Amino acid sequence: MLELDFEQQLGDLYLQVNTQLPTEGITAVFGLSGAGKTSLINVIAGLIRPRKGRIVLNDHVLVDIEKGICLSPEQRRIGYVFQDARLFPHYRVKGNLQYGMSPEMKPEFDSIVSLLGIEHLLSRFPLTLSGGEKQRVAIGRALLTAPDLLLMDEPLASLDLPRKRELLPYLEKLSGEVNIPILYVSHNLDEILRLAENVLVVDNGKVRATGKLEEVWSSSALRLWLQKETLSSILNVSMVEHHNRYEMTAVALADQALWLPKMDVQPGTDLRIRIDASDVSLVLEPPRGSSIRNILAVKVVEFFDDNGHVDVKLVLSGHYLWARITPWARDELNLRSGQWLYAQIKSVSFHRQL
């Protein structure tokens, strides 16, 4: 467990954090630019000293200002991958990887290099590498220090789209194969949906929400921090079967089935899907002869009027789903909390295999 309870004034930003984070998998630190995401992980790394508070990682006290404890960055066993790779230009890739390498990681050198797909780069200098290659080397260097925690500050932010696509699969492999907790700073929703199991939402130096991605994403609080066009639902589902005639795959969503475009996965595979609120419509009775394949029984939890549209939070067997409708539709449906009706889902985006 990573226990955070600290405060610090940083210019106009007052950073005030009090939360606990799991020390497994990837936790995304999400917020708009200037929210305090990078400042938060810089305090954890020891690059910023908090004015007061405590930081404890797996029962190891990193900071306790009241007791005069504030370990230096090199004492914390924390790896850090910056937006820019910060490689040593006069060292080849192998030299960069070995710089600061922990003795206990020497037997793991080849496996880390293989995991990141950088075997063919070992003899090259950083100047000859693409942005994505540099970041893979930087990640490898951080892993080889044997950290108890890995911090990643928007590692894709400086990359163009092809380089981002090049690096993302390696980050996915990293989350599944390396048993090191990762705090991943980003304001990019697609990155978070593809990589993270948990999410911490930061706004104006404060923690607004934290927890499992599906739970936080469905919370009414997070809705206020998302751009209107990005309101969506994240659902963890399990693959059931492929259609024997059509290129479609069925997944289980609680006790109901959802049909998606065919995916090359085996029955029982856990998946994460994303459904945009604008792709969900509501009806009082299931229609007959509809072209829409996914019609689910749902209950209204709450709804919000917002600038010409209505966002409706729905629940089905513990899973939450957002729909975006017009005020006219709200009135015609006589919408109210606790009401049962049917959600029609026009399209579904597949985001990751869990």
Swiss-Prot record:
Cross-referenced Gene3D superfamilies: 2.40.50.100, P-loop containing nucleotide triphosphate hydrolases
Keyword entries, A-Z: ATP-binding, Cell inner membrane, Cell membrane, Membrane, Molybdenum, Nucleotide-binding, Translocase, Transport
Residues annotated as binding ATP: G31, L32, S33, G34, A35, G36, K37, T38
Subcellular location: Cell inner membrane
One Pfam family linked to the record: TOBE
Single annotated GO MF: ABC-type molybdate transporter activity
Top EC category: translocase
InterPro entries, A to Z: AAA+_ATPase, ABC_transporter-like_ATP-bd, ABC_transporter-like_CS, Mo/tungstate-bd_C_term_dom, ModC_ABC_ATP-bd, Molybdenum_import_ModC, Mop_domain, P-loop_NTPase
Protein's job: Part of the ABC transporter complex ModABC involved in molybdenum import. Responsible for energy coupling to the transport system.
Quaternary structure and interacting proteins, as annotated: The complex is composed of two ATP-binding proteins (ModC), two transmembrane proteins (ModB) and a solute-binding protein (ModA).
Protein name according to UniProt: Molybdenum import ATP-binding protein ModC
The species this protein was found in: Photorhabdus laumondii subsp. laumondii (strain DSM 15139 / CIP 105565 / TT01)
